[in-house]
């Protein structure tokens, strides 16, 4: 008995092999998404953990104004401290040799005279660490070195106390502090074009800095759970040395950005496989439901021959599981390659110190099991329906339904036949349409992600930052200096800029960011409203927040906030209580905005800035003059930063290249799923109607007319499915968008007309293509044999 059902199973699989293959492809894509995404996710988490552990990444960092190096020994004796290191960290201007960008912002980080530091050790990628002694040598952080094409033996020129000092590059290194080479929490975006880290031996630099025998930063590795307590105790104990608030590992800028990326990665790793595997289950259910109806006579015969309901149930479940097994095998192989690709792309982007790539067989097994479960669940409904049939009911066939209302409406024959077939079994038609709608959901999802990314970049680069040239000064001058720049040839407009690092306190929550002063009516820095998109300007005593920062701090319009300058000292400090205004739509970064004059009066004056002091300028320049204006600024000793809008755009596009790669792969997978789903839907309809179409051929219908009938029916189902999937697709896209917002990048959902057109038209086109294999089969039918087949 079992052998006979096994023989029938093999014959059924052979007869519907392409439908089984199509279902397996959908399931396989889901498994590939699950295995590949989670493999990449797991490898990145492990790579972070291994890099942090091997290089002793600091659990807590405390900045100091100046303290004797002897405090390092005292701190090492505190309970809970495992490793401690004291060092000098200084930001300064760095000049480069001809052929490279003229001047950048550098950060000097000192190393012990001979060995690796006890905390935040370095991995040498090329060359060696500085030796120390009489020779002035430096090792460069890898992303900065790669961007500016530094090799061991090259020279670099930091400016120490206003003097240009030559250092020889001895090595290229990777640091756990600068996996993402970000300058601070206020400037939470990697900018290797304009910011680099130089590691030098302490004995080579401390006298030049006037800091001999001193440290201004202490880093510690602590026992688990002790970082907050120890950091706060050090801050309190050494407040006489200007100790700052401790920065834990979770708050460290590079790690903050890395963890934000991982948090944004996780929802896609869950949602995308779920969508694919759910669609596979639906496809199995649709195909087997039609098979069960087409095989009612066979089921009745088997039941009459003594086969129990459990055997019938198992038989149809095995059909679904066979499709799931095929999908699982394909998906594991494809997912492994996908996981390797993700790991490689991410490693190339970040220059991870230790890149760990493991196959994670437990994920492969889980993915294979999910494929079996999804397809098994999809088969369960039709299998139970078949098992519940009594022999007499099954062999009698279905009783024709009473004439429908649509049947009484006079319609042309070529329209009446397909419409009758659709309305005769509305639930089955709806199920098929839902299968097509699933592909519409995925097409909207992937298309809208690309649309939203492009729209976000346009908003940031063309509206928020609408300048041609950004200039940052070494020391804040008064804004009167801008009158001089306005007279330069090619300069069309100059606007002042004042940016200060601040800490926001609200209802027990705090966040460090940068506060930017905005000129009323500014044309070069616009603040589009989140709700209307129209430019806004902060009222006096009010600050405008990005929508991402408002959500993080749980802010509402009108909330009172304490905003303090982060580098307050006994000599200079500034803070104010201000109210929050309406949210600004800014996709990149989380700054806050205040009126320029308001910022100068409330913060600039208390901090000792010149009257109407500024930290930079924004310029609009005629295209033919941009290079010369940039060169003039780079030649000025009072200018620390010069950046064109094209350079900013290039940095941002480089950062988003990883996301674009993901979205492109999602779109390819989505197109493959859409084709597979529409093929199963259309081909199962053709299998079900084989006898009817063969009868039409014997009545004189040519294949041309039959093709039109089939195409009309399938197009109606496809159009219904596309319409069904439209709204859920938008909701799923919005949910994924909300779940994947990161610390540095927050997009607003945008669905372009092209995406709507693609999502609506693609299922119709795919259905049209997917029906041709079935039509070719019908054109080659043995008509007499087909008509003798037992229909429903």
Can you say where each PLM-predicted feature lies in the sequence?
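N-terminal Sec/SRP start-transfer signal
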Residues: 1-34, 291, 308, 317, ...
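Membrane transport/envelope proteins' first extracytoplasmic loop
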Residues: 2-278, 290-293, 309-310, 348-349, ...
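Short cytosolic juxtamembrane segments of multi-pass membrane proteins
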Residues: 3, 388-404, 779-792
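Interfacial "coupling" helices/loops that link adjacent transmembrane helices in transporter permeases
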Residues: 12, 16, 266, 282-322, ...
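Juxtamembrane segments of multi-pass membrane proteins
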Residues: 53, 59-65, 413-540, 544-547, ...
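Short coil/turn motifs that cap or connect alpha-helices
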Residues: 151, 308-309, 390, 556, ...
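Small-residue-rich transmembrane alpha-helices
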Residues: 278, 282-297, 321-353, 361-388, ...
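C-terminal transmembrane helical bundles of large multi-pass transporters
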Residues: 497, 614-621, 630-733, 738, ...
């Amino acid at each position: 008995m079992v052998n006979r059902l096994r023989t029938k199973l093999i014959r059924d699989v052979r007869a519907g092999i392409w439908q089984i293959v199509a279902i397996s492809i959908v399931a396989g894509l889901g498994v590939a998404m699950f295995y590949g995404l989670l493999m990449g996710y797991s490898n990145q988490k492990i790579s972070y953990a291994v890099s942090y552990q091997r290089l002793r990444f600091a659990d807590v960092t405390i900045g100091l104004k100046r303290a004797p190096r002897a405090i390092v020994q005292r701190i090492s004796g505190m309970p809970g401290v495992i490793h401690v290191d004291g060092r000098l960290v200084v930001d300064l201007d760095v000049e480069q040799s001809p052929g490279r960008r003229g001047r950048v912002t550098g950060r000097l980080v000192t190393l012990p005279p001979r060995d690796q530091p006890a905390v935040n050790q370095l991995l040498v990628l090329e060359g060696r660490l500085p030796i120390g002694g009489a020779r002035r040598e430096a090792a460069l952080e890898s992303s900065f070195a790669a961007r500016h094409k530094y090799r061991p033996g090259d020279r670099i020129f930091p400016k120490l106390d206003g003097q240009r000092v030559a250092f020889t590059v001895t090595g290229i290194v990777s640091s756990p502090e600068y996996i993402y080479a970000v300058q601070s929490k206020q400037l939470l975006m990697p900018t290797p074009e304009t910011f680099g880290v130089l590691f030098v031996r302490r004995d080579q630099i401390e006298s030049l800095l006037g800091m001999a025998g001193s440290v201004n930063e202490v880093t510690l590795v602590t026992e688990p759970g002790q970082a907050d307590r120890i950091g706060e105790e050090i801050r309190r104990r050494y407040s006489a040395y200007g100790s700052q608030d401790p920065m834990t590992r979770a708050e460290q800028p590079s790690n903050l950005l890395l963890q934000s990326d991982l948090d944004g990665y996780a929802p896609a790793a869950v949602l995308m496989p779920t969508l694919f595997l759910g669609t596979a289950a639906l496809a199995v259910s649709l195909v087997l439901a039609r098979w069960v109806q087409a095989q009612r006579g066979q089921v009745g015969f088997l039941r009459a021959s003594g086969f129990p309901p459990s055997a019938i149930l198992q038989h149809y479940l095995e059909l679904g599981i066979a499709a799931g097994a095929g999908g699982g095998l394909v998906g594991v192989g494809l997912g492994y390659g996908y996981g390797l690709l993700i790991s490689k792309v991410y490693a190339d982007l970040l220059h991870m110190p230790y890149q760990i790539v493991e196959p994670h067989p437990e994920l492969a097994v889980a993915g294979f099991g999910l494929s079996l479960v999804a397809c098994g669940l999809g088969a369960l409904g039709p299998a139970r329906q078949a098992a519940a049939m009594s022999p007499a009911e099954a062999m009698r066939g279905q009783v024709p339904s009473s004439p429908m209302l649509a049947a009484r409406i006079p319609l042309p024959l070529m329209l009446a036949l397909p419409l009758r077939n659709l309305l005769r079994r509305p639930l089955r038609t709806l199920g098929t349409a839902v299968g097509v709608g699933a592909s519409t959901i995925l097409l909207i999802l992937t298309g809208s992600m690309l649309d939203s990314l492009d729209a976000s970049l346009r908003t940031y680069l063309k509206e928020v930052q609408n300048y041609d040239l950004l200039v940052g000064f070494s020391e804040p001058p008064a804004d009167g200096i801008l009158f001089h720049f306005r007279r330069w040839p090619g300069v069309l407009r100059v606007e002042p800029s004042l940016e200060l690092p601040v800490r926001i306190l609200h209802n027990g929550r705090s966040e460090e960011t940068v506060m930017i002063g905005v000129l009323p009516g500014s044309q070069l820095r616009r603040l589009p409203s989140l709700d209307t998109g129209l430019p806004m300007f902060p009222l006096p005593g009010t600050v405008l927040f990005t929508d991402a920062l408002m959500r993080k701090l749980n802010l509402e319009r009108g909330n009172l906030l304490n905003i303090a300058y982060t580098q307050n000292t006994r000599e200079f400090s500034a803070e104010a209580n201000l109210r929050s205004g309406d949210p600004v739509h800014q996709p990149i970064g989380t700054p806050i905005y205040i009126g320029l004059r308001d910022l100068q009066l409330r913060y600039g004056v208390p901090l000792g800035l010149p009257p109407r002091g500024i930290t930079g300028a924004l310029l609009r320049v005629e295209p033919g003059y941009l290079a010369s204006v940039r060169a003039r600024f780079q030649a000025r000793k009072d200018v620390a930063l010069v950046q064109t809008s094209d350079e900013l755009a290039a940095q941002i596009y480089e950062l988003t290249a990883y996301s674009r790669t993901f979205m492109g792969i999602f779109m390819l997978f989505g197109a493959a799923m859409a084709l597979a789903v529409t093929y199963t839907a259309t081909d199962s309809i053709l299998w079900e109607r084989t006898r009817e179409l063969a009868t039409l051929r014997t009545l004189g219908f040519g294949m041309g007319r039959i093709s039109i009938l089939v195409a009309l029916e399938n197009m109606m189902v496809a159009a219904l499915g596309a319409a069904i999937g439209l709204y859920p697709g938008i909701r799923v896209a919005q949910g994924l968008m909300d779940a994947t917002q990161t610390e540095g990048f927050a997009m607003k959902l945008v669905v372009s007309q092209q995406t709507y057109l693609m999502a609506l038209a693609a299922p119709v086109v795919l259905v049209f293509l997917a029906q041709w294999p079935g039509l070719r089969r019908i054109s080659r039918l043995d008509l007499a044999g087909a008509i003798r087949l037992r229909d429903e």
